[in-house]
């Protein structure tokens, strides 16, 4: 049997005080092959569970004596050993990775009993790869909607709604870099290529003070490290896309790289099948991920991460003399360089320089009319984070962050024959900064507290010009210009964060948290998902920062030696300065965009249940959310509260994975949710506009009659998906391995509405909602390989 880990024990020094033995400081460093640091490794010391930090490091203070220690991590073999602690000790543990495609599905979850952090969950790619997905394309953002408290906008939507928040209120990060548009194909898929991703973590409440800038959640996606010892590759070929990844050492044992690419071939297949009809029309998207790291020495590491991806949609119609062309290109570019330093066993820091950009370009021609539009957002960021652990009773974290924003709110031009209209919407600029400090304190053996304070600052500056608004909020028709660096509107807010953990007997605990968050950037959209025509706008004199406050309390219980995990969380959240648009608002090429906005408040509350089986041939979980979310705007619904469009009273997810035998594994997912709320007319009536003076005949128009906003519910959404994973040679020691994944999406062919439109019967003067459906039953097959 090969060794699953190697362990080196080094006794550094001992202290004695009088006749009494002093507690010993025990430092544990967990690594993989090539000295790769394993973050989030689970360490059990006499059944007390801890986790390593981002550098694979853990320090605890233990009374002298004999201890049984178990170390485990996702995709690595676990390691158990006993050790006598009679002095300060350093433990270096190297875990051996698992290589097979099959294996028990395990959720890497921080919702355990002993962790002070609540409302946090994470999933690894090994699990997501086995679950059934639409068209065989793995999508981490869709997978996390199977967890309680996280919803999508409906069939095929990637807009995420966490505990009553909007799609722009989630801080989506790739290796710590913000992503402003995480969607492909108008929201059908996300930009995260499963071949390049290691895990995804979601924080729904009790947000730590080192995160900010969004109201609702943090969605932290981590890409994979490369292999420092040997060259390896992996990939997959599916129905609509293929992906390939290559990794290996740059300097063996010290430096590695990982390069991954994905592209759809919807356009290529369509041209082969129907070339005469398709012509140059088509759509595709691609992603490229790159990551490299370099261990300068045991205490210093450099990390570089990069992503670029675009969607390209083309349409042309020249039949019957028509000249119609439509070409839209949109995408993200991200890059970051990070320096990680372990100054001592107690002090470490990470400093990063980050660049990110989202851009949209559209060129359209309709006969003699041409239209061009471009928008985007570009950031340059620098940040530093520090962590100090004094002993087992106290841990401090602090840091600083600065971001320079450049907004391109939608410049363009319209040409009609010889006439041309050029939109002169100026770019906007802003400075955003924040500092934070947080401390973890063990008050008593049973009571732990995490208290933090984040202080955020935002300043919209010139050069730009803006419309002047009167006291009534309406435009005066005048503009005001600002010089470079001149302040237009500045805001600063304290954001306190505090959470408690109280341990109960028999592997149970109670947790509570309070969080205040501020958001200075807003997504200008009248749609539910983040479509590429949406515009990011900064807070200013008229647009105030959005603020949210959330309280949460939960009960957590582990059973049968941590094989089962149960939890229940209740939350209540208020939101101020929420944005909606007036009916019929024009977003594109609008110099008075702020004048189209109205401002209000929101409230969300609910309770989430989660039950999980983590080990054995059968694994899985059940998640259920009972919730309510409302919005209140003085200028909408007569000032009365109304149901938020994506309110979902009941939301249920059942996920199961069963190992049939050594070669076959089965997974199934069932989801059920209350239908989205929407506004439909109750009837239709004629309205007399007066007389036509030319022939003295009355002029009538027809008007739809509405009772209230979002007083209608779409039918309940429910669906069953299944998938099978087949590995021909699961225990093969050969370098090359492969597996097949077969899936069926929407097994019983449920007709879930994608949207509802209004059909008008002009003769009977009636209106009726017509449902449009998107996905019927869809089979898929994907071949995965690695070498």
Where are each of the predicted segments found?
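C-terminal beta-signal and adjacent terminal beta-strands/loops
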Residues: 663, 672-700, 715-721, 725-787
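Flexible loop and strand-edge segments within Gram-negative outer membrane beta-barrel domains
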Residues: 281, 299-381, 421-428, 531-532
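Gram-negative outer-membrane beta-barrel transporters
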Residues: 571-574, 593-680
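Outer membrane beta-barrel strand-and-loop segments of large Gram-negative receptors
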Residues: 379-385, 424, 432-434, 538-544, ...
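Short, acidic, small-residue-rich periplasmic hinge/interaction motif at the N-terminus
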Residues: 31-36, 42, 72-76, 86-134, ...
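Surface-exposed extracellular loop regions of Gram-negative outer-membrane beta-barrel proteins
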Residues: 359, 406-417, 421, 459-477, ...
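A beta-strand signature from Gram-negative outer-membrane beta-barrel systems
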Residues: 93, 146-147, 191-230, 234, ...
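Periplasmic N-terminal accessory/gating domains of Gram-negative outer-membrane beta-barrel systems
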Residues: 108, 113-168, 173-207, 224-225
């Amino acid at each position: 049997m090969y060794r699953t880990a190697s362990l080196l024990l080094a006794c550094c020094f001992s202290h004695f005080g009088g006749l009494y033995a002093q507690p010993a400081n025990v430092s544990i460093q967990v690594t993989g092959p090539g000295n790769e640091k394993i973050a989030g490794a689970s360490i059990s010391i006499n059944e007390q569970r801890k986790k390593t930090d981002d550098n694979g490091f853990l320090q605890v203070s233990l009374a002298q004596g004999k201890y049984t220690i178990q170390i485990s991590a996702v995709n690595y073999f676990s390691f158990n050993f006993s050790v006598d602690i009679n002095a300060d000790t350093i433990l270096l543990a190297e875990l051996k990775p698992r290589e097979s495609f099959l294996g028990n599905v395990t959720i890497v979850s921080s919702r355990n009993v002993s962790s002070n952090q609540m409302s946090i969950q994470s999933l690894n790619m090994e699990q997501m790869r086995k679950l059934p997905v639409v068209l065989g394309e793995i999508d981490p953002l869709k997978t996390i909607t199977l967890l309680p408290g996280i919803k999508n906008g409906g069939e095929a939507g990637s807009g995420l709604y966490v505990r009553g928040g909007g799609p722009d209120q989630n801080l989506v990060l790739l290796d710590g870099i913000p992503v402003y548009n995480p969607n492909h194909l108008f929201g059908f898929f996300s930009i995260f290529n499963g071949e390049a991703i290691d895990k995804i973590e979601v924080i729904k409440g009790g947000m730590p003070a080192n995160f900010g800038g969004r109201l609702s959640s943090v969605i932290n996606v981590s890409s994979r490290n490369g292999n420092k010892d040997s060259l390896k590759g992996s990939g997959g070929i599916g129905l609509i896309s293929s992906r390939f990844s290559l990794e290996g050492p740059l300097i063996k044992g010290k430096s590695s790289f990982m390069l991954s690419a994905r592209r759809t071939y919807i356009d290529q297949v369509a041209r082969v099948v129907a070339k005469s009809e398709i012509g140059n029309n088509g759509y595709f998207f691609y992603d490229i991920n790159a990551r490299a790291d370099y261990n300068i020495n045991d205490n210093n590491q450099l990390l570089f991460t990069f992503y670029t991806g675009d969607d390209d949609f083309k349409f042309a119609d020249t039949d019957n003399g028509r000249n119609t062309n439509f070409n839209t290109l949109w995408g993200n570019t991200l890059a970051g360089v990070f320096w990680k330093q372990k100054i001592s066993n107690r002090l470490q820091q990470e400093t990063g320089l980050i660049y990110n950009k989202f851009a949209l370009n559209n060129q359209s021609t309709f006969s003699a009319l041409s239209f061009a539009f471009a928008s985007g957002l570009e950031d340059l960021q620098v940040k530093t984070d520090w962590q100090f652990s004094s002993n087992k009773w106290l841990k401090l974290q602090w840091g600083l962050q600065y971001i320079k924003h450049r907004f391109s709110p939608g410049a363009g031009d319209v040409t009609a024959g010889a006439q041309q209209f050029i939109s002169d919407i100026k770019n906007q600029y802003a400075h955003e900064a924040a500092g934070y400090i947080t401390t973890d304190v063990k008050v008593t053996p049973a009571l732990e507290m995490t208290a933090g304070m984040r202080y955020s600052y935002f300043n919209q500056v010139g050069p730009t010009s803006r419309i002047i608004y009167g006291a009534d909020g309406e435009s005066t028709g005048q503009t005001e210009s600002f010089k470079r660096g001149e302040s237009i509107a500045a805001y600063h807010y304290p954001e306190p964060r505090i959470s408690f953990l109280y341990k109960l007997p028999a592997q149970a605990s109670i947790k509570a948290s309070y969080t205040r968050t501020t958001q200075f950037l807003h997504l200008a959209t009248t749609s539910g998902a983040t479509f590429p025509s949406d515009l990011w706008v900064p807070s200013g004199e008229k647009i105030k920062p959005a603020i949210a406050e959330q309280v949460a309390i939960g009960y957590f219980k582990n059973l049968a030696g941590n094989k089962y995990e149960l939890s229940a969380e209740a939350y209540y959240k208020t939101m101020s300065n929420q944005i909606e648009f007036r009916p019929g608002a024009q977003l594109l090429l609008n110099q008075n965009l702020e004048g189209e906005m109205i401002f209000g408040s929101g409230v969300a509350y609910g309770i989430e249940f989660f039950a999980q089986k983590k080990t054995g041939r059968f694994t899985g979980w059940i998640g259920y959310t009972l919730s309510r979310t409302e919005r209140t705007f003085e200028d909408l619904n007569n000032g009365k509260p109304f149901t938020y469009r994506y309110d979902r009273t009941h939301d249920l997810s059942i996920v199961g994975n069963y190992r049939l035998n050594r070669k076959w594994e089965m997974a199934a997912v069932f989801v059920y949710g209350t239908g989205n709320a929407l506004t439909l007319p109750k009837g239709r009536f004629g309205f007399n506009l007066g007389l036509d003076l030319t022939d003295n005949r009355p002029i009538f128009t027809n008007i739809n009659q509405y009772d209230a906003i979002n007083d209608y519910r779409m039918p309940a959404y429910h669906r069953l998906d299944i998938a099978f994973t087949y590995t021909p040679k699961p225990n093969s020691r050969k370098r090359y391995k492969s597996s097949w994944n077969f899936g069926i999406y929407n097994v019983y062919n449920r007709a879930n509405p994608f949207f509802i439109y209004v059909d008008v019967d002009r003769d009977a003067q009636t209106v009726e909602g017509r449902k449009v459906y998107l996905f019927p039953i869809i089979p898929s097959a994907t071949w995965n390989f690695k070498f």
